[in-house]
Amino acid sequence: MAKRSKAYLAAAEKVDRTKLYSPLAAARLAKETATTKTDATVEVAVRLGVDPRKADQMVRGTVNLPHGTGKTARVIVFAAGEKAAEAEAAGADAVGAEDLIERIQGGWLDFDAAIATPDQMAKVGRIARVLGPRGLMPNPKTGTVTTDVAKAVSDIKGGKINFRVDKQANLHFVIGKASFDEAKLVENYGAALDEILRAKPSTAKGRYVKKVTVSTNTGPGIPVDPNRTRNLLDEDA
């Protein structure tokens, strides 16, 4: 394990690991325990009571964060003709078809999200092994395979995020920056949590949301009460 910095260790001492924090208290503490001078990213990890090995227990979805992520996503679009023009007008960072695929095959991956029109998916399939493991493969379930490319670009740049359970039944997503006030962080968290709860598989048994941790990308994890799904802006009782 990498040696922790003095700043990290000092921040970790502020976290009481014997308690479960309210989302509001956790957001406040995450801001306090960011250990860099740069604007740290605030992240959430959720452990779910599902078995990702079963196809009917795969949890995935999208959510438009009401306050965005604090970062403007770099979006590419696989499209041609009129749809390519629409994507460019909407602010896509790169638009193309065969040329864009060749660029990615050459090692270029300087983007955060990829969108494709349905007619381009057969071609995009050639780079599925590059995009898939990075969570960048366009998919109809996340709204990234669509004919309405302008809306898809606008949504992603406006703060739309994707979530997908990993092999260990964990979800990871961003809810903003340490510079956000805690209420905005909590409202973003609540929007994501609502979508995760809606995505609960009918075959999942027992407790669905088992563990929640909030942290900055530079600070210690803060345990959050997984049962707090309503009145998230309330303080601890």
Swiss-Prot record:
Supply the Pfam families for this chain: Ribosomal_L1 (PF00687)
Q: CDD domains under this entry? A: Ribosomal_L1
Q: Note whether rRNA-binding occurs among the keywords.
A: yes
Q: Which InterPro entries match?
A: Ribosom_uL1_bac-type, Ribosomal_uL1, Ribosomal_uL1-like, Ribosomal_uL1/biogenesis, Ribosomal_uL1_3-a/b-sand, Ribosomal_uL1_CS
Q: Name one GO cellular component term.
A: large ribosomal subunit
Q: Which domain of life is it from?
A: Bacteria
- Keyword line: Repressor, Ribonucleoprotein, Ribosomal protein, RNA-binding, rRNA-binding, Translation regulation, tRNA-binding
> Which GO MF term does the entry hold, naming one?
tRNA binding
Q: Name one GO biological process term.
A: regulation of translation
Q: Does the keyword ATP-binding apply?
A: no
Subunit composition? Part of the 50S ribosomal subunit.
State what this protein does.
Answer: Binds directly to 23S rRNA. The L1 stalk is quite mobile in the ribosome, and is involved in E site tRNA release.
Q: Family, per the entry?
A: Belongs to the universal ribosomal protein uL1 family.
Q: What's this protein's name?
A: Large ribosomal subunit protein uL1
Q: List the source organism.
A: Nocardia farcinica (strain IFM 10152)
Classification lineage: Bacteria, Bacillati, Actinomycetota, Actinomycetes, Mycobacteriales
